[in-house]
Amino acid sequence: MIVFSLLLPLVLAAQDPSLPLPSDSYPDQRTAELVRSARGARERNERLVTSYTATVSQRLGVGIRAASRDRMLYRQELAARIEWYRDKPSRIEVVGAREGIPIALRKDQIPESLDEQVRSLIVNPAEDYLRVGFDNSDSDDGFVYPLREGGESLYRFAAGDSTVISLPSGQRIRLIELHIIPRQSDWRLMSGSLWFDADSYGLVRAVFRPARPFEFRRDTDPSDREDVPGWVNPKGEVKYVTLEYGLYENRWWMLRFVAMDAVGSMGTWLGVPFRMERVYADYEVEGGTPPDTASTFRPAGTIGRNDVGARFRIHAELGKSLRA
């Protein structure tokens, strides 16, 4: 706690927007303008969504790979209908749910803790939705969003290529790519690309992976390792995460597809591959009015109030002090 108290003022100072940005944050003015516009778009667009309805389906599977043999360890399918509201409680109706554990059970069953799992399907359009694979709780798990204010302290940026896509309506939209480059080798920092609509700067696509794999002995608190033998050091590597958005009502970019491919490992003899896909469809979106700044109501899908970036820096500094 003493170390934490000494470092906290330094961490908060690093968040101060009045402090100068690192000189290598952007290679050119084009990149700086793209980052500025993408940040501003969140205030103009996604936060104005007042309600939406959509259907969602999710499939995930966990395998086990040992002694040159692959087996299915766990599989799950969920389907639901979402009625989301920004300013009042939302509703989600489960249409179907089943899970199978082939190595232990002969038949599929209704998933345990279904209530919590279904909640994770709800998307708040105003959130930085980069915590794929984690629940929508107040925990600090997940990736540090690059475009958060002060993100330049953890990331560098570079404008990439532009491309044109055609929608079923015949409308053509130009996309601009933004490369995300982590400053540190940490599993909570992402490396990849974001594509934005050149007109509205709404997020259209994201493809990324962590800066490095997660390592139990490197990335957990000492208290979590006390009762674990020293030779045990499981690792987890996310191969890729993909987010794709669709344009609805010719205005709102809403999440329509999520995919993640990962693998856990224990040495060279045991692998646990994981695959998840989630599809949102049948959107009906309403909006146009800003939220009440005095309201304390938290819409469904809100991912906690804590600043993940600040927590990341605190943990990083504590880790350095403990190693010293």
At which residue positions do the language-model features occur?
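Bacterial N-terminal signal peptides
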Residues: I2-V11
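Beta-strand-dense domains in secreted/periplasmic systems and polymorphic toxin scaffolds
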Residues: A206, R256-M260
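Extended lipid/amphipathic-ligand handling interfaces
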Residues: F196-A198, Y240-E249
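Beta-strand-rich interaction surfaces with strong enrichment in secreted/lumenal proteins
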Residues: V228-V232, E244
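Active-site and channel-lining beta-strand-loop segments
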Residues: S191-A198, V207
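Structured extracytoplasmic
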Residues: Q15-S191, P210-P222, G236-K239, A262-A324
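Transmembrane beta-barrel wall of Gram-negative outer-membrane proteins
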Residues: L247-F257, W269
